[in-house]
């Protein structure tokens, strides 16, 4: 339960899970990095515009060069908080987190071109949708590795 709580606090803000785990330097570092990347990417404005339905304006308001750092920072902070709180003991349990980071990063890159049924989901909602294939791919690859891989695998 403690590990799941840390994930949810890390979803709220990268670094909060580490603070709850009493890893203050690491937590404050994640918060600082989140603030820098968020500010330099102009991400809060893109979030606001996306929720207001101004998806095309959100697409042009962000700095993709900075925002592409965000998914890896975000999902690594979640994994770290989860692991340090006692989760992630099973072999390859990091894979869903890692594949979420990969899929969300790719989703961010293709967001300007991702149009379904005339709807542009933009730089906020399309990458969020990409979490689903990230989790599924991570779980699938974990299952394959556990089934056919080395029995001495470690997390």
Label each PLM-derived region with a short phrase:
Residues 1-6, 34-155:
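Transmembrane helix recognition focused on a "late"/terminal membrane span
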Residues 9-26:
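Membrane interfacial helix-start motif at the N-side
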Residues 27-34:
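Short hydrophobic alpha-helical segments that form membrane-spanning helices or hydrophobic packing faces
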């Amino acid at each position: 339960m403690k590990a799941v709580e840390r994930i949810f606090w890390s979803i709220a803000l990268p670094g909060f899970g580490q603070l709850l785990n009493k890893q203050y330097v690491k937590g404050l570092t994640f918060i600082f990095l989140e603030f820098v990347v968020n500010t330099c990417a102009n991400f809060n404005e893109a979030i606001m515009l996306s929720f207001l339905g101004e998806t095309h304006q959100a697409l042009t308001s962000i700095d993709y060069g900075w925002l592409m750092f965000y998914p890896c920072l975000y999902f690594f902070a979640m994994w770290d908080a989860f692991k340090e709180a006692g989760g992630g003991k099973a072999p390859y349990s990091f894979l869903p987190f890692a594949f979420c980071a990969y899929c969300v990063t790719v989703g961010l890159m293709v967001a300007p071109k991702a149009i379904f049924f005339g709807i542009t989901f933009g730089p906020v909602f399309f990458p969020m949708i990409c979490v689903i294939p990230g989790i599924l791919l991570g779980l699938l690859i974990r299952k394959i590795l556990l089934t056919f891989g080395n029995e001495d695998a470690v997390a």
